[in-house]
Amino acid sequence: MRNYISIALLLLASSVFAYDPPTMGWSSWNTYRVNISDKLIMKQADAMSRNGLKEVGYKYINIDDGYFGGRDASGELITHPVRFPNGLKQTVDHIHALGFKAGIYSDAGRNTCGSFWDKDSLGINVGFYGHDRQDADYFFKEIGFDFIKIDFCGGDAKQNFDQLGLDEQERYTAIHNAILATGRKDVRMNVCRWNFPGTWVHDVAFSWRISQDINPSWES
C-alpha cells in the first residue's frame, strides 16, 4: 500500500511541476547576418537532424533577417530573388519534414535591423507596421511558421531612416493580437528589445531579450 501511495505522490508532483521547456534551437543571425539562403537553412536543418539535436531539445530552426525582397503592389511580402528564389514555403516544409519547428524574423516597425546596420535595402518597409494582419496571415496561415522573433529597430527612432518612434508595448500587443486572429494558438513570439521590456511582456510573448547582442564566441 505504501508503494502505491509513493507512486501516486510522484505522479502528482510531476503534474504540479510540469512546464513548457524553453525555446531551443538555431538562428541564422549571429553567424550569417543577412547573408543567408534557402539552401543554407535547409543544410543547417539536415545537419541538426543528422547530429541528433532534436532529440535533446533543440527543435527550432529560425530564419532571421535577410530573406526579404520587399512588398508587391498589394502590400504582400515577397522574398529575396536570389537568396530565396522559391519563396519560404519550400524551406519551411523541409524543416517540418525533419520533425523540427520553423521560425521567422520581422520587425515591429517599418524597417528591419539589417536594413540599418547591414545596409540591406530590401529590408526597408517590410516590417509589421501597417501590415499586422496581412503579415500574420502570411507567416502563420499561408507558410506555417511556428515561431517569430520581432525586432524593434524599425520602431526605435535612433535605428531607422524615417526616425519613426513607436510605443513598444502597443506595437507588440497589436502583433500578438494579429497572430491570435489567425487561429493559431501554438505560435511562440519572441520580443527582441535590447533589455528587459517590462512586465507587460508576460502577456504577449513566450520569450524576450534581456541584454544587448551577443556574438558567436564562448567569451560572449
PLM region spans:
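Sec-dependent signal peptide recognition
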Residues: 2-9
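N-terminal signal peptide c-region/cleavage motif recognized by signal peptidases
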Residues: 13-15
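N-terminal module-boundary/linker segments of secreted carbohydrate-active enzymes
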Residues: 18-42, 47, 179
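Short helix-terminating capping/connector loops at secondary-structure junctions
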Residues: 19-20, 54-57, 183-186
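Aromatic-lined carbohydrate-binding/catalytic grooves of carbohydrate-active enzymes
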Residues: 40, 44, 48-161
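Short secondary-structure boundary/capping segments
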Residues: 76-78, 119-121, 172-175, 203-208
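Glycan-recognition surfaces
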Residues: 125, 131, 187-220
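Extracytoplasmic, non-cytosolic globular domains
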Residues: 146-148, 153-187, 191-193
